[in-house]
């Protein structure tokens, strides 16, 4: 339960590490499809399920990738973003037998209007072969302050540029889901 109606959140904290360990220890069950099976049981209660996870390919992340339809891959310009995106694509390819419909869509984050950022964004759009959100998420100190304060961005700064950017991304995503 949260302060927001119709939204439930399972935080990515130490509980997930324990869940990963428990999944590994339960060798008699099919560990990699546990989340997909659990989500099927509650599918009437939710329109969407968003799982925030790190890049470490542990059992929890594998479960998420197998249950997912779409991976939104944040890309922050910093030197390793292209390699990280390619690694993610390879990891997803390894899971195609179990989840053949899983897609990746890149989301440019922490975007600045400098030459490097614009070059990476252009490469992603034109040469990378990755599907990409039209709206980039601009860099703003407000987003960092919101994270530090542990307050959701729209509550911390309702009219800020980053809140507006994320709303645009959500609208893009909802429009895509309707098609």
Where is each model-derived feature located?
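Short, hydrophobic alpha-helical segments
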Residues: 173-179
């Amino acid at each position: 339960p949260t302060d927001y109606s119709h939204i439930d959140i399972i935080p990515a904290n130490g509980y997930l590490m324990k869940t990963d360990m428990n999944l590994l220890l339960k060798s008699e069950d099919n560990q990699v499809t546990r989340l997909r099976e659990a989500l099927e049981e509650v599918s009437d209660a939710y329109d969407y399920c968003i799982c925030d996870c790190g890049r470490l390919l542990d059992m929890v992340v594998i479960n998420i990738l197998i249950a997912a339809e779409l991976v939104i891959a944040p890309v922050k310009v910093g030197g390793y973003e292209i390699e990280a995106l390619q690694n993610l694509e390879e990891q997803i390819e390894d899971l195609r037998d179990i989840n053949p419909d899983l897609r990746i869509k890149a989301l440019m984050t922490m975007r600045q209007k400098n030459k490097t950022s614009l070059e990476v964004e252009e490469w992603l759009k034109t040469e990378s072969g990755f599907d990409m959100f039209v709206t980039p998420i601009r860099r703003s100190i407000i987003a960092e302050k919101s994270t530090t304060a542990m307050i959701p961005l729209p509550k911390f700064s309702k009219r800020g540029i980053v809140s507006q950017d994320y709303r645009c991304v959500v609208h893009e995503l909802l429009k895509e889901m309707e098609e």
